[in-house]
């Protein structure tokens, strides 16, 4: 990629997103059967799991690679990727990654378990992948996260649309990317509509987000992405 090429962010459904920068490709929360629009497996240099305790586990499939937690299988197309699934600070292929402990509920994980939100610095752009977070952030957590440009936020999970909007007010990103989680399309549409109303947003759906550090908007905008993933 040339130096002027934008970072690309593609959503593959649920909490799976792929960030392509100049030096590396990051795939967050890949599920075992994820493939791209062409039917080929998605590839990447770095894989992050925001909820390793409950990530999809393939059973009866010969191909796959265990992540560091020892239970989660990642797609074979990501065999060579560097896997991150816990809190901490990392640098891989010029990508700075900060994993911050979060929870999938508002009860310190006692109901739905722990999670990890990852801040990914790619091409000078700070993107936070919130995974399946279920709560607002404390001042301490906000300090650990720092300033973010793009926020990928779950909609339709344990985090209500109102709390999701409040979380975005806490983080104050330039771009908000909703990730719908519901199993029922109707529930997803309702939750997304409520979130967009809370945000005061009327976004247009697009296949991917392409952005550079210099092209980030001055005020927060919400971008709806088409799900590019499909079951293998």
What is the predicted role of each segment?
Residues 1-22, 80, 86-89, 94, ...:
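Zn-dependent metallo-beta-lactamase
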Residues 19, 47, 97, 132, ...:
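Divalent metal-coordination and catalytic microenvironments
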Residues 33-83, 143-152:
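Active-site metal-binding motif and surrounding structural segment of the metallo-beta-lactamase
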Residues 10-12, 85-86, 111-112, 175-232:
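Binuclear metal-ion centers of metallo-dependent hydrolases, dominated by the metallo-beta-lactamase
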């Amino acid at each position: 990629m040339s130096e002027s090429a934008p970072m690309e962010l593609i959503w593959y459904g649920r909490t799976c997103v792929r960030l392509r920068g100049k030096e590396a490709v990051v795939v967050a929360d890949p599920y075992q059967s994820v493939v791209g629009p062409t039917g080929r497996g998605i590839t990447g240099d770095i894989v992050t799991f925001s909820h390793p305790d409950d990530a999809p586990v393939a059973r009866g499939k010969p191909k796959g690679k265990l992540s560091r937690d020892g239970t989660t299988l990642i797609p074979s197309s990501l065999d060579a990727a560097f896997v991150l699934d816990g809190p901490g600070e990392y640098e891989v292929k010029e990508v700075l990654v900060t994993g911050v402990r979060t929870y999938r509920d508002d009860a310190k994980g006692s109901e739905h378990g722990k999670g990890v939100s990852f801040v990914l610095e790619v091409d000078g752009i700070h993107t936070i992948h919130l995974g399946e977070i279920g709560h607002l952030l404390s001042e301490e957590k906000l300090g650990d996260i720092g300033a973010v440009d793009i926020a990928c936020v779950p909609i339709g999970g344990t985090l209500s649309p109102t709390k999701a909007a409040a979380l975005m007010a806490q983080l104050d990103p330039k771009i908000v990317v909703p990730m719908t989680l519901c199993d029922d399309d109707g529930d997803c549409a309702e939750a997304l509509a409520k979130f967009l109303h809370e945000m005061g947003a009327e976004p247009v759906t697009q296949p991917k987000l392409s952005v550079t550090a210099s092209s980030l908007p001055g005020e927060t905008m919400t971008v709806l992405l088409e799900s590019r993933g499909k079951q293998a």
